[in-house]
Amino acid sequence: MAPKAEKKPAAKKPAEEEPAAEKAEKAPAGKKPKAEKRLPAGKGEKGSGEGKKAGRKKAKKSVETYKIYIFKVLKQVHPDIGISSKAMSIMNSFINDIFEKLAGESAKLARYNKKPTITSREIQTAVRLVLPGELAKHAVSEGTKAVTKFTSS
């Protein structure tokens, strides 16, 4: 059975090459010039496109994560404890979810009040609505402190 398996890939490779050759032969009539324009541009972009791809990768990398900040807070609270990448991912998702809830709620509040701008007041009210009890109180006090520090500097 091993020789048959070896024969099949050998038979498939020429079969794969033949359609490519046939496509190249069929394409010259009208589509090959367009294909040539696209292929060299693609090849040219690979050389200079690595910068573009790197640019695209940079754009993908600009997706904000809170991993650095989660780690900093963890080290402030428990300096000798680490965190797994899966736990970090869960925490990052948690923060993104809370952020989306707060943003949505503050946008609703701005709409209800017929205001075009989300201010710290809408954010504070959204925090009180989204977060439960004591957690909301602490979040509001920390947020107020952060806004005061920001405006004073």
Curated annotation (Swiss-Prot):
Residue(s) carrying N6-acetyllysine: K7, K37
Cross-link Glycyl lysine isopeptide (Lys-Gly) (interchain with G-Cter in ubiquitin), sequence positions: K149
Subcellular location(s) per record: Nucleus; Chromosome
Region of interest (Disordered), ranges: 1-61
Cellular component GO terms held in the UniProt record: nucleosome; nucleus
UniProt PTM: Can be acetylated to form H2BK6ac and H2BK33ac. Monoubiquitinated by BRE1 to form H2BK143ub1 and deubiquitinated by UBP26. Required for heterochromatic histone H3 di- and trimethylation at H3K4me. May give a specific tag for epigenetic transcriptional activation.
Annotated keywords: Acetylation, Chromosome, DNA-binding, Isopeptide bond, Nucleosome core, Nucleus, Ubl conjugation
Start-end of Basic and acidic residues biased regions: 1-28, 36-53
GO terms of molecular function: DNA binding; protein heterodimerization activity; structural constituent of chromatin
InterPro entries: Histone-fold, Histone_H2A/H2B/H3, Histone_H2B, HISTONE_H2B_site
Pfam families named among the record's database cross-references: Histone
Main location: nucleus
PROSITE patterns: HISTONE_H2B
Record's subunit section: The nucleosome is a histone octamer containing two molecules each of H2A, H2B, H3 and H4 assembled in one H3-H4 heterotetramer and two H2A-H2B heterodimers. The octamer wraps approximately 147 bp of DNA.
Similarity section: Belongs to the histone H2B family.
Purpose of the protein: Core component of nucleosome. Nucleosomes wrap and compact DNA into chromatin, limiting DNA accessibility to the cellular machineries which require DNA as a template. Histones thereby play a central role in transcription regulation, DNA repair, DNA replication and chromosomal stability. DNA accessibility is regulated via a complex set of post-translational modifications of histones, also called histone code, and nucleosome remodeling.
Stated name of the protein: Histone H2B.8
